[in-house]
């Protein structure tokens, strides 16, 4: 990748506008002054406690805990369940972050074993869970599923999974890295979506635009145990204030945008129908994100992206391979950039893609 190309583009297609460090830190300082924010000390303080509880209440959990990374959050949560049940078996879709993108930490650290659920290209169902006869301590469900373009189970399918886990006494954990993005599709509150999950992880930087960090949510006893285990892993950061302020000052504003971002995604799908050379996954929008499928090999897609950046000043993103050698996908998160781009400008970009010759 030519790292300087993106920086010289006037139009970035996916995601939200990124402030410079100076802009972001200035906004944080101003917000801290207006709200008289005081530092936490090793995670204890009025401001951080209030924010943790605010998010816990929003999702219907008893308590919340700031954790510096989602990688630490989720593996620890699942390991705690396995320890309690004295059974190291968990289940999840094979596209899950733990399974694919965490350097097999769960294996090398002997934390738990993973049974893959369902079809690689579809959200898994209660039927897929029942295909495993094993005794399972916990299952993880990612809502929505990023590697599938933001696909979600139907509301009935999700409720069937909740009921099946309750029936089999399986701890149901939510990977809610992009939970904020799915309420508009379900037309349900976050609390309704989270009901039936015993624990959840949410990101403070993806849809929220914060500097980083995450929250683990669950009952008070579970969160107290998790807090101890985060300390044992080196996660006991002295001041968490910067991360929490960065998220808290944007939290309500970003959640309020989600319906408009989903509506914009629906509009983009209609525009995409004008270009039959291009495909999109999922077939209908289920969150404010999508996989744009182009009829190009990865190498040709990269070449096209760089040419568009050089000639037009437009950055498409990072293409990925598919099962087909002459297909690639661009993941587009529909944030304020696509919300504000003119339809005709978007059509020009799509026409460039549709008529590309590499």
Language model features: what each stretch is:
Residues 1-42, 56-59, 331-340, 344, ...:
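N-terminal "arm"/small-domain region of PLP-dependent enzymes with the aminotransferase-like
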Residues 113-114, 172-174, 315-316:
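Hydrophobic beta-strand scaffold residues
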Residues 82-141:
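PLP-dependent aminotransferase-like
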Residues 85, 277-358:
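Conserved C-terminal alpha-helix-loop-beta "cap" of PLP-dependent enzymes
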Residues 18-69, 83, 94-99, 105-107, ...:
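Conserved N-terminal alpha-helix of the aminotransferase class I/II PLP-enzyme fold
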